[in-house]
Amino acid sequence: MKFGFLSGIGEITPSIFSGLDAVNKARIFINLYNCCAGRELKIPLIYAYSGLNLEEIFLKRIDDLCEFKNPSRSKISSFCIASNAVICAYKSGKFDAVPPLAVSPKHPAAKLIVMLKSQNGICFDADIMFSQFVYDKIRAKHFDKNVYFQDGIIFAEQGGRKLFGVMPCFKEITKERFHLANCEIARGFEALSGGEFDRMFIVAPRNANFSRYIEVKRECGRGGSLRLVPYTISHHIF
């Protein structure tokens, strides 16, 4: 399931987000994208509230990065030939005429331009983006613990003991349709059966029909606690 945009095609949106307005869709995409992007390629969240579509947001970010404000005459900034060639070609509308670069550009705007051009847009696997997002949030909240991925499950460990497991599930879950996560539920109970920890959370994107957790009980009544949890895609740590 892809999420992003491709030049000449337009935006590609997972069905779970298809009913959102432009601002909320952009806000969610930027939050997910920033978890997968390097520091210089991240997009400030303020761009989501501009009312622009995803492609326009990235082009606006490039234009803003290309502006040189209040240059200091007392400092000599490093000059990157590759970056200059890319930015000049972009500004003149002749990017296709730029020959292959022997070195990678250093300027953030040039890096974004090259990324957009090489991929004909920005489009990621939504499952991977969501998993990385959940991992980053858990690691930030539990900074004093060892947080790691193992077999598709995020574990938090302290003192050599697993405390809980979190399984990202990029599906449109509701109280009436939580069977869509049957595969993840089975894997969760299987992991709990090992006895190394007693709490498992299967997290899926929050939606209008999935705003409270769902407790899932095993038929035999044993095997630890397992919950389906609505996960908010936000820059906040909670």
Protein language model annotation of sequence segments:
Residues 118-238:
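Catalytic core segments in nucleotide and nucleic-acid processing enzymes
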Residues 1-120:
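Terminal, charged accessory segments of proteins
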